């Protein structure tokens, strides 16, 4: 009776990318990939800051322009302008590197998502970016000039206004970021409608309340009793809410069609 030596078959290891795509990558592999992508993001940020360092002065000039042609903020401390300069370089560098950093983040998480989730991400990111940039443009070209004109000259007959560059940049960046986030309202409400937190009918019933809120926000941005300026500020916010109602109706309709098909 003859016996044959059987050699056990050795399973070949899958490449990391294929294993990840199939959801078979071990925990250690995920940590290694996360570390690599994080390192790439940090390198991109450092390079972005280095590039932005050479453009910090024009950027500061661009941000002070809404104050008017004769406006020139003061340096109230020895290190004040230097602090503003490096902060602007850091944030501008982050903005320059953000597309690559976002790509690294998406590349890490997308293999774990299903088809619908991937589709949502690739639609949502451009939409969110465009809306935020629209908010920044509205703040810079529409909201800031009249707001700064009032704030900088309020009390000229009583006090001498000396505006520090650091204080000025803080006010301007807060208004820019605030309006950039406010312009994300349609997307946020659309997500809430998709989750069933709000409905188109509920949003429509709160329309009058939002009009009041829009004028309150406009009054905070531009503290004046001029109805024209108030309407210019509040108008886009009201339009954003109407867009939110329309988007929520689309989401609700699609959600109903999916449930009926099941």
From Swiss-Prot:
Organism domain of life: Bacteria
Region entry Disordered, spans: 1-26
Keyword Cell membrane: yes
GO BP terms, alphabetized: intracellular protein transmembrane transport; protein transport by the Tat complex
Membrane-spanning ranges: 42-62, 90-110, 120-140, 175-195, 209-229, 232-252
Keywords: Cell membrane, Membrane, Protein transport, Translocation, Transmembrane, Transmembrane helix, Transport
Subcellular location: Cell membrane
Pfam families: TatC
Assembly and oligomerization: Forms a complex with TatA.
PANTHER family recorded: SEC-INDEPENDENT PROTEIN TRANSLOCASE PROTEIN TATC (PTHR30371), SEC-INDEPENDENT PROTEIN TRANSLOCASE PROTEIN TATC, CHLOROPLASTIC-RELATED (PTHR30371:SF0)
Name this protein carries in UniProt: Sec-independent protein translocase protein TatC
Organism name: Dehalococcoides mccartyi (strain VS)
The organism's taxonomic lineage, starting at the top: Bacteria, Bacillati, Chloroflexota, Dehalococcoidia, Dehalococcoidales
